[in-house]
């Protein structure tokens, strides 16, 4: 047998991190041939202490029964399947001694008399219980005992019965009157045994109890009265409006009313008849309910009534915009109260707002009652399309949100203006973050920035650069040639695409004619950098071969001039 392992606290321990640790231990157990910490046993405790969380196969853990339990020390073993052997039935609850019956009473065993069990005590009718009505089997040192002493059942006692004028009572005892004792009244006789008084009322009363604790007499004592007189009538919970005298004469009428909180059933006026009789039959005053409580923002039925009899009901309903919480009706109880508790009317609430706002967020109020407002806010760079808020409103009998979720669209710049003699190239769109490019038509050069970006300043989207200008390309006159001329203007400024023509000068007075060598017409164009150039070199004017004198040759001397210089703007 393996030696016992030192096992620290009874399980579970404060040092075990609860469910998280338990889950981790279960996970680890599936990967190792070990047992986890054994479950905590309510009836036994380990004899040694350990901080280990895992135990090798074959480990023995020793236990002893806890106070309140009996049994021999035992061990549980970690088996090959990583499960501990069962500790069931190793310890049994100790039993308290059989509880004695109280004097004149009984002890009731509810289930058993073992540790933690409870018993009840009771007394028969006519007796009251002195002491505790229950006891529990608890630990005391190494044993178990009942936590309360056995009570006593005392007989319920009544006080002396009431005395009557012109009469007396008879009973088994004139000093001790226990529960159930009966006394009988009789009237005194006159001289020579003559009957001069009439016994009115119940001749016998007995000792009883309403709460099984205090003894009371079953009713009022009778009276011995002179014939053709009536004693004051008694109506429980009633008040005699007429003079309250000891005797009333024949045919005399008295009036009753009920105490507050009670309602009258029967006639309010009765008349004294022969033999101490009151006619008609005396009324009764039964407990009634006052008008039920008013509920804020609610209507109820039977508002015109001042008193309600037991069993009567009133119904509540809430005003539009409110929900009723509690019972819709109350009923008047025999005790003069309303049951159940009055309801309340709470402001209606809308359901949780579940809509989502892509590229934005929803701002919720503290509550969702009628009038609550949910705000919609777009992220930076986006603008709201739709309602900026939704309100909880009343629609018939329902509370609803009055608008749906809007859309957060990306903010856009204004449509960019097209430069004169230029173009705008939108690459994707004109939303914030997008770029556009500018270009000029042929014959024009771009002055300014060739691109712009849609940016955000505060809440406004605008283009980062002003639109450029497309300026027309102008160049000076083409080169002059000897013995020739061109059609350019004296001031120059030849626009793009303009053509100029060359001709040779005639010299008839000298008998010379020049020939134009090259292109007679050249045109204004541009090179890739936007600079103006002529389409070809300027032509030249030459004499025919062998023609003219030496002077003529000088005049017609060959000059090769190229018009390839740039036209800068």
Swiss-Prot record:
Keyword Repeat attached: yes
Localization (cell): Cytoplasm; Membrane; Secreted
Major subcellular site: cytoplasm
Coiled coil residues, start to end: none
Tissue-by-tissue expression: Expressed in fetal liver and to a lesser extent in fetal spleen and thymus. Expression appears to be limited to hematopoietic and fetal lymphoid tissue.
Record Gene3D superfamilies: Complement Module, domain 1
GO biological process: negative regulation of complement activation, classical pathway; regulation of complement activation; regulation of complement-dependent cytotoxicity; T cell mediated immunity
PROSITE patterns: SUSHI (PS50923)
Residue ranges constituting the Sushi domain according to the UniProt record: 33-93, 94-155, 156-226, 228-287, 287-347, 348-410, 411-472, 473-543
Signal peptide (from-to): 1-32
A Pfam family per the record: Sushi
Glycosylation sites: 48
GO CC, one annotated term: plasma membrane
InterPro entries, A to Z: Compl-Cell_Adhes-Reg (IPR050350), Sushi/SCR/CCP_sf (IPR035976), Sushi_SCR_CCP_dom (IPR000436)
Sorted UniProt keywords: Cytoplasm, Disulfide bond, Glycoprotein, Membrane, Repeat, Secreted, Signal, Sushi
Superkingdom per UniProt: Eukaryota
Cystine residue pairs: 35-78, 65-91, 96-137, 123-153, 158-207, 187-224, 230-272, 258-285, 289-332, 318-345, 350-392, 378-408, 413-454, 440-470, 504-541
Subunit structure: Interacts with iC4 (methylamine-treated C4) but not for iC3 (methylamine-treated C3).
Family: Belongs to the receptors of complement activation (RCA) family.
PANTHER family, sorted: COMPLEMENT COMPONENT RECEPTOR 1-LIKE PROTEIN, COMPLEMENT COMPONENT-RELATED SUSHI DOMAIN-CONTAINING
Protein name per UniProt: Complement component receptor 1-like protein
Source organism: Homo sapiens (Human)
Recorded name of the encoding gene: CR1L
């Amino acid at each position: 047998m393996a030696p016992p392992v030192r096992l620290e606290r009874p399980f579970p321990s404060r040092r075990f991190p609860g469910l998280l640790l338990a889950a981790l231990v279960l996970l680890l157990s599936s990967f190792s041939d070990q047992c986890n910490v054994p479950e905590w046993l309510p009836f036994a405790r380990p004899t040694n202490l350990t901080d280990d969380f895992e135990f090798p196969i074959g480990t023995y853990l020793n236990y002893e029964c806890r106070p309140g339990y009996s049994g021999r020390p035992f061990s549980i073993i970690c088996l090959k399947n990583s499960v501990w052997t069962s500790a069931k039935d190793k310890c049994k609850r100790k039993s308290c001694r059989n509880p004695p019956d109280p004097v004149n009473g009984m002890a009731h065993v509810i289930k058993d008399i073992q540790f933690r069990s409870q018993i009840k005590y009771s007394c028969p009718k006519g007796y009251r219980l002195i002491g505790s009505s229950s006891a529990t089997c608890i630990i005391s040192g190494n044993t178990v005992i009942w936590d309360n002493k056995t009570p006593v059942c005392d007989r319920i006692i009544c006080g002396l019965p009431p005395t009557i004028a012109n009469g007396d009572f008879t009973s088994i005892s004139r000093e001790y009157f226990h529960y159930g004792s009966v006394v009988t009244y009789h009237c005194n006789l006159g001289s020579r045994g003559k009957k001069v008084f009439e016994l009115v009322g119940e001749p016998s009363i007995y000792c009883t109890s309403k709460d099984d604790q205090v003894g009371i007499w079953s009713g009022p004592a009778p009276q011995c009265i002179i014939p053709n007189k009536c004693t004051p009538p008694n109506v429980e919970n009633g008040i005699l409006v007429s003079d309250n005298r000891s005797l009333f004469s024949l045919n005399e009428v008295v009036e009753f009313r009920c105490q507050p909180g009670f309602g009258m059933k029967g006639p309010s006026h009765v008349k004294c008849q022969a033999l101490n009789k009151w006619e008609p039959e005396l009324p009764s005053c039964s407990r009634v309910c006052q008008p039920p409580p008013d509920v804020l923002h609610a209507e109820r039925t039977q508002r015109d009534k001042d008193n309600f009899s037991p069993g009567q009901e009133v119904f509540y309903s809430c005003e539009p915009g409110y929900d009723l919480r509690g019972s819709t009706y109350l009923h008047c109880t025999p005790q003069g109260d309303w049951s159940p508790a009055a309801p309340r009317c709470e402001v209606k609430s809308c359901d949780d707002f579940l809509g989502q706002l892509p590229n934005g967020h929803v701002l919720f109020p503290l509550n969702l009652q009628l009038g609550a407002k949910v705000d919609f806010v777009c992220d930076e760079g986006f603008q709201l399309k739709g309602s900026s808020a939704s309100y909880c409103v009343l629609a018939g009998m329902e509370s609803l949100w009055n608008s749906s979720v809007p859309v957060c669209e990306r903010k856009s710049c204004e449509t960019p203006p097209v430069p004169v003699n230029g173009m705008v190239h939108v690459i994707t769109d004109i939303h914030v973050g997008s770029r556009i490019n500018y270009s000029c038509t042929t014959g024009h050069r771009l002055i300014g920035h060739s691109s712009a970006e849609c940016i955000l300043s505060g809440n406004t989207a605008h283009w980062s650069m002003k639109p450029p200008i497309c300026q027309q390309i102008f160049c000076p006159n083409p080169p002059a040639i000897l013995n020739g001329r061109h059609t350019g203007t004296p001031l120059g400024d030849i626009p793009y695409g303009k053509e100029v023509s060359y001709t040779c000068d005639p010299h008839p007075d000298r008998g010379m004619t020049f020939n134009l060598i090259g292109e007679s017409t050249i045109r204004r164009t541009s090179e890739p950098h936007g600079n103006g150039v002529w389409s070809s070199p300027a032509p030249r004017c030459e004499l025919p071969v062998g023609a003219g004198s030496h002077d003529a040759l000088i005049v017609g001397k060959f000059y090769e001039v190229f018009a390839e210089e740039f036209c800068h703007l």
